Swiss-Prot record:
It is found in: Secreted; Host nucleus. Changing residue 204 to G: No effect on cleavage. Sequence repeats lie at residues 184-190, 191-198, 199-206. Changing residue 201 to G: No effect on cleavage. One of its GO terms (cellular component) is extracellular region. Keywords: Disulfide bond, Host nucleus, Host-virus interaction, Repeat, Secreted, Signal, Viral immunoevasion. May regulate immune response to the intracellular capsid in acting as a T-cell tolerogen, by having an immunoregulatory effect which prevents destruction of infected cells by cytotoxic T-cells. This immune regulation may predispose to chronicity during perinatal infections and prevent severe liver injury during adult infections. The record marks 183-184 as: Cleavage. Its main location: secreted. Residues 25-27 are annotated as: HBEAG. The lineage of its organism: Viruses, Riboviria, Pararnavirae, Artverviricota, Revtraviricetes. This is External core antigen. GO terms for molecular function: DNA binding; RNA binding; structural molecule activity. Residues 184-212 form a propeptide.
Length: 212
């Protein structure tokens, strides 16, 4: 398996720090968190169950449909675009290597072990990474982090003391458990109309009438 890791490092041409984190940090057990610079952590992502994340194929289709022009552009758009570019490239290289191993590895048991490892371990990490950056581009990074915190609070709360349904990212601003810091906008409630004060002339006439 170490040889598999080494082949992946060699075949995955990753010129940026973000991609180096992806390849080296996860594979060699280095204490490198690819989400920290974006305000999140691997632990925060781990609160979401594995079946929460769409398949890599669906995520790649989503990224292509929404951000293809920006991803293919030679310009620097944002750190999320850069991370997506490198993740997509690394996934392509990983699939190429997995195909090569599947063709050239004669032992069926070893071949199945490699395929299972890629799908179970690397596949989940790529699904998490792709989902995170696509969601940050779609909903905003602060909203996504807020959602991860809210889901973490929800999942760790005993069922008897939490809402029946988990938070939903697309409706987070209305249903979030954890609100952004800062003053919340005050709602203006319609105040009852004040009775217009009577003019001095009117009050004087009334006082004269009362004296008569």
């Amino acid at each position: 398996m170490q040889l598999f890791h080494l082949c992946l490092i060699i075949s995955c041409s990753c010129p940026t720090v973000q991609a180096s984190k992806l390849c080296l940090g996860w594979l060699w057990g280095m204490d490198i968190d690819p989400y920290k610079e974006f305000g999140a952590t691997v632990e925060l992502l781990s609160f979401l169950p594995s079946d929460f994340f769409p398949s890599v194929r669906d995520l790649l289709d989503t990224a292509s449909a929404l951000y293809r022009e920006a991803l293919e552009s030679p310009e620097h758009c944002s750190p999320h675009h850069t991370a997506l570019r490198q993740a997509i490239l690394c996934w392509g290289e990983l699939m190429t290597l997995a195909t090569w191993v599947g063709v050239n590895l004669e032992d069926p048991a070893s071949r199945d072990l490699v395929v299972s490892y890629v799908n179970t371990n690397m596949g989940l990490k790529f699904r998490q990474l792709l989902w995170f950056h696509i969601s940050c581009l779609t909903f905003g990074r602060e909203t996504v982090i807020e959602y991860l915190v809210s889901f973490g609070v929800w999942i760790r709360t005993p069922p008897a003391y939490r809402p029946p349904n988990a938070p939903i990212l697309s409706t987070l601003p209305e249903t979030t458990v954890v609100r952004r810091r800062g003053r919340s906008p005050r709602r203006r409630t319609p105040s009852p109309r004040r009775r217009r004060s009577q003019s001095p002339r009117r009050r004087r006439s009334q006082s004269r009438e009362s004296q008569c």
